[in-house]
Swiss-Prot record:
This is Aspartate--tRNA(Asp/Asn) ligase. CDD domains: AspRS_core, EcAspRS_like_N. InterPro entries: Aa-tRNA-synt_II (IPR004364), aa-tRNA-synth_II (IPR006195), aa-tRNA-synth_II/BPL/LPL (IPR045864), Asp-tRNA-ligase_1 (IPR004524), Asp-tRNA-ligase_1_N (IPR047089), Asp/Asn-tRNA-synth_IIb (IPR002312), AspRS_core (IPR047090), GAD-like_sf (IPR004115). It is found in: Cytoplasm.
Length: 579
């Protein structure tokens, strides 16, 4: 080994030892008769002292920041008053006798711990990863995966790998396709998840499976998504919903306790999908901001205000939420901004009032009685603001108000977004209508067990034995009890409009397995990238992935995706169309 110790290892107890350290030159300071180098590696930092009479002193003239060096020297206690309490090695320094330059660095585009634009950080990711922030995040990620593996091992789970080259079964996002050279015109697909394989493992008798696995989705990348991502994939046989939730809570609690020393209260809260939509306008609620949506129809019974009256006559709803102590921010200009945002979200407009010494609102002339009713019933206090909207589509109304609630919360109440709000969302509808495909699609996936009493021909009434875990408004995991009866699986395919021959073409190998003994089973998949980002306090998953893609799926470091050699395309019998 070139080194005897790391840069974060030496302590006062090592005083007098001859040591060799290797690392990057973080900083150089010249105080005349003595020169100091802060030497850094992933373990920490050590101060190197180069006295004027040493060979090491002369070598410093050749050094540049971020050069990689080997230092030989002796450990000594720092003089009293010069200790650095901010680093683990702050009580000692190494008096250098020799410095060997292993790799001299040219001037860098930026230096670790600087914060250039993200494009620059991604282009030179190997420099960015030297920063303390990124180093801590990557180490945290490793520690979390280590805890997860240990947890499942203790419970008797087996970590089993599943194929990356598999069959395309397009449901939901597009597959990444891989052409086969040996079978021209045929394609593999990279897995969007190991869903079918983990169910086949249950059918194979491996009753407790987990895997930390890469997954791939060729989708239009929304904010903070990646085309390749990592799941903690879990499946169990002979279980019900309570079993899966209990094991999942144990994993999350263990991760928080061992990774960041935080004890979580279990079991976690649970709310139904319906309750989440009614109170928060989303199935991924962040409850830390408060401001629950409220049904305000009672205040508008018999109203003469035409806009709301017409909505109510059509069977629509009136809802709103209270923003506490927001009156000083709620100017006419702010009201106009929120009005425009409400229209962007599909609402006809927005009504608002604030409580000061009296009620203030541009709508007061027409709605004073209604506002006073709301103030009394909802116990509004001076300084509170109430935002109100009406629409005949209750789902749209909930979602639009939920978005406004969250945007106001993040902009004005970020001080409330402390800690971790963890809950389960349960009792999902099985199907949702896809405007793009003009048909009902499975909200989770078509292998989810329905609540059998609800399984009929009316898509809107079918419930799923599905569950999502949400932390701070992000879906961190989702799963379900799976179908283990062939007739139910065929019924679901039929409700999805999938013909028998189409189902056989896509899932024949899977349906064949249903003939030969399928245990009741269920599972869950956690998004590791998102879980780590939340625990690290990062807003973007790119901050916890060593080599992420940009928002449009490009690797700025390598230039992927890129053109390939014409010979490779000919071997695959692929022709690229221009434009």
């Amino acid at each position: 080994m070139l080194r005897t110790h790391t840069c974060g290892e030496l302590r006062v107890e090592d005083e007098g030892k001859k040591v060799k350290l290797c690392g990057w030159v973080d900083r150089i300071r010249d105080l005349g008769g003595v020169r100091f180098i802060d030497l850094r590696d992933r373990y920490g930092e050590t101060q190197i002292v180069c006295d004027v009479n040493s060979k090491a002193y002369e070598t410093v003239d050749e050094l540049t920041r971020e050069s990689v060096v080997l230092v030989e020297g002796t450990v000594r206690r720092r003089p009293e008053g010069t200790e650095n309490p901010n680093i683990a090695t702050g009580e000692i320094e190494v008096v250098a006798e020799r410095i060997e330059i292993l790799s001299k660095a040219e001037p860098l585009p930026f230096y670790p711990n600087e914060t250039p634009k993200e494009e620059m950080r991604l282009r030179y990711r190997y420099i960015d990863l030297r920063s303390k922030r990124m180093r801590d995040n990557i180490i945290l990620r490793y520690n979390i995966t280590r805890v997860i593996r240990r947890y499942f091992d203790e419970l008797g789970f087996l970590e089993i790998e599943t194929p990356f080259l598999t069959k395309s079964t397009p449901e939901g996002a597009r597959d990444f396709l891989v052409p086969s050279r040996l079978r021209p015109g045929k394609f593999y697909a990279l897995p969007q998840s190991p869903q079918l394989f983990k169910q086949l493992l249950m059918i194979s008798g491996f009753d407790r499976y987990f895997q930390i696995v890469r997954c791939f989705r060729d989708e239009d990348l929304r904010a903070d998504r990646q085309p390749e991502f990592t799941q903690v994939d879990v499946e169990m046989s002979f279980v019900d919903v309570e079993d899966v939730l209990s094991v999942s809570e144990g994993m999350i609690a263990r991760v928080f306790r061992e990774a960041i020393g935080m004890d979580l209260k279990t079991p976690f809260d649970r709310i139904t999908y319906s309750e989440a939509m009614e109170k928060y306008g989303t199935d991924k609620p962040d409850r830390r901001y408060g401001m629950e949506l409220r049904d305000l129809g009672y205040a508008f019974e018999g109203t003469t205000f035409r806009v709301i009256r017409s909505v109510l006559e059509e069977g629509g709803s009136v809802k709103g939420f209270v923003v506490p102590e927001f009156a000083s921010e709620m100017t006419r200009k702010k009201g106009d901004e929120l009005m425009e945002r409400a229209k962007e979200l599909g609402l006809g407009g927005l009504i608002w009032f604030k409580v000061e010494e009296k009620i203030v609102s541009p709508h007061l002339k027409h709605l004073e009685r209604e506002f006073k009713t709301i103030v009394e019933k909802e116990n509004l206090k001076e300084g509170d603001v109430c935002l109100i909207a009406a629409h005949k589509d209750r789902n749209l109304l909930n979602e639009a108000l939920g978005t406004l609630r969250l945007e106001i919360g993040k902009e004005y109440f970020s001080h409330l977004a402390k800690g971790f709000d963890i809950l389960w969302v349960v009792d999902f509808p099985y199907f949702e209508w896809s405007e793009e495909e003009e048909r009902f699609v499975a909200r989770h996936h078509p292998f989810t067990m329905p609540v059998e009493e609800t399984l009929g021909d009316d898509h809107t009434k079918v419930k799923a034995k599905a569950y999502d875990i949400v932390i701070n408004g992000y879906e961190v995991g989702g799963g379900s009890i799976r179908i283990h009866k062939r007739e139910i699986q065929e019924k679901i395919f039929k409700l999805l409009g999938m013909r028998e021959e189409e189902a056989r073409e896509k899932f024949g190998f899977f349906l064949e397995a249903f003939k030969y003994g399928v245990p009741p089973h269920g599972g869950i998949a956690f998004g590791l990238d998102r879980l780590v980002a939340i625990i690290a306090g990062e807003n973007s998953i790119r901050e916890v992935i060593p080599f992420p893609k940009t928002g449009n799926g490009v690797c700025l470091l390598t230039g992927a995706p890129s053109s390939v050699d014409e010979k490779q395309l000919r071997e695959l019998r692929i022709r690229v169309e221009e434009g």
